[in-house]
């Protein structure tokens, strides 16, 4: 059974589940209801605020508590569709006896080799942790970052969490995208909240969606357990 530790943020859960369902159709031809995997989905509230620093101890505790509760339901492995939570990946995995997929590793696999200039869009804690930048630089890719881009991403994430946000968030995204596209040949969406906007836009340069990469790996791992 697939375990999904979701709710970070709440609006990222349903797009992730949709992507898992899509990959069931793409990877093994699921069509009838009975063809889809058993999934245990636990939406775990966490003390994340887009406008203030994270209390890492409280954040880590909330996620580990959620992961342990999810494991007790009998899941075979866990997918956690939240990039910021992967700052604590080692501690979370140590608290579990089942494996947890790593969203960064799965996302990096999908980056095309010709890409040389990457922009990583994520929360302040994700960017500050450099969990993407370290791997990208190790692969010979330049990571471009500007402080005012980060401020715009922070505003975008905060706006997504509000009701009836689409018109406002698409305008915020368009302004940010127009500048980023002049500097980068690939964008990495390292925040699953951004799917609320990015799933509905077109881009002339590739956007690597960490949520989709994790969903693909979730289904591939499920199939490996079935074989």
UniProtKB/Swiss-Prot annotation:
pH dependence, record text: Optimum pH is 8.5 with L-lysine as substrate.
Residues that coordinate or bind substrate: 51-53, 83-85, 161
Alphabetized UniProt keyword annotations: Isomerase, Sporulation
InterPro entries: Asp/Glu/hydantoin_racemase, Asp/Glu_race, Asp/Glu_racemase_AS_1, Asp/Glu_racemase_AS_2, Asp_race
Temperature profile: Optimum temperature is 37 degrees Celsius.
UniProt KW Isomerase keyword: yes
Enzyme class: isomerase
Gene Ontology MF, one: serine racemase activity
Disulfide bonds, paired cysteine numbers: none
UniProt entry tagged with the keyword Metal-binding: no
Top-level division of the source organism's lineage: Bacteria
Active site: 82 (proton donor/acceptor), 191 (proton donor/acceptor)
SUPFAM superfamilies: Aspartate/glutamate racemase
GO terms of biological process kind: sporulation resulting in formation of a cellular spore
One Pfam family this sequence matches: Asp_Glu_race
Reaction equations catalysed: an L-alpha-amino acid = a D-alpha-amino acid; (2S,6S)-2,6-diaminopimelate = meso-2,6-diaminopimelate; L-lysine = D-lysine; L-arginine = D-arginine
EC number in record: 5.1.1.10
Family: Belongs to the aspartate/glutamate racemases family.
PANTHER family documented for this protein: ASPARTATE-GLUTAMATE RACEMASE FAMILY, GLUTAMATE RACEMASE
NCBIfam families: asp_race (TIGR00035)
Protein task: Amino-acid racemase able to utilize a broad range of substrates. Preferentially catalyzes the epimerization of LL-diaminopimelate, as well as the racemization of D-lysine, L-arginine, L-ornithine, L-lysine and D-arginine. Has lower activity against D-ornithine, L-histidine, L-alanine, L-tyrosine, L-phenylalanine, L-serine, L-glutamine, L-methionine, L-asparagine and L-homoserine. Has weak activity against L-norleucine, L-aminobutyric acid and L-norvaline. Has no activity toward nine L-amino acids (Thr, Glu, Asp, Val, Leu, Ile, Trp, Cit and Aad).
SUBUNIT field: Homodimer.
Protein name as it appears in the record: Broad specificity amino-acid racemase RacX
């Amino acid at each position: 059974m697939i375990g999904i530790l979701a709710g970070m943020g709440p609006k990222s859960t349903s797009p992730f589940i949709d992507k898992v369902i899509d990959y069931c159709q793409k990877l093994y031809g699921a069509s009838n209801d009975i063809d889809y995997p058993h999934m245990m989905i636990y939406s775990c509230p966490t003390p994340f605020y887009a406008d203030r620093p994270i209390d890492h101890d409280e954040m880590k505790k909330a996620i580990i508590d959620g992961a342990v509760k999810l494991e007790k339901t009998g899941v075979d492995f866990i997918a956690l569709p939240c990039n910021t939570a992967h700052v604590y990946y080692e501690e979370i995995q140590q608290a579990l006896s089942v494996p947890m997929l790593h969203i960064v590793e799965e996302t990096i696999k999908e980056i095309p080799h010709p890409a040389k200039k990457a922009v990583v869009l994520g929360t302040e804690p994700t960017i500050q942790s450099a969990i993407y930048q370290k791997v990208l630089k190790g692969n010979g890719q330049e990571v471009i970052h500007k402080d005012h881009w980060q401020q715009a991403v922070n505003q975008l994430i905060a706006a997504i969490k509000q009701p009836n946000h689409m018109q406002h968030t698409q305008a915020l995204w368009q302004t940010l995208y127009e500048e980023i596209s002049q500097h980068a040949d690939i964008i990495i969406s390292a925040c699953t909240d951004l799917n609320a906007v990015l799933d509905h836009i077109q881009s002339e340069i590739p956007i690597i969606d960490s949520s989709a990469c994790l969903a693909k790996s979730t289904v591939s791992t499920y199939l490996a357990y079935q074989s």
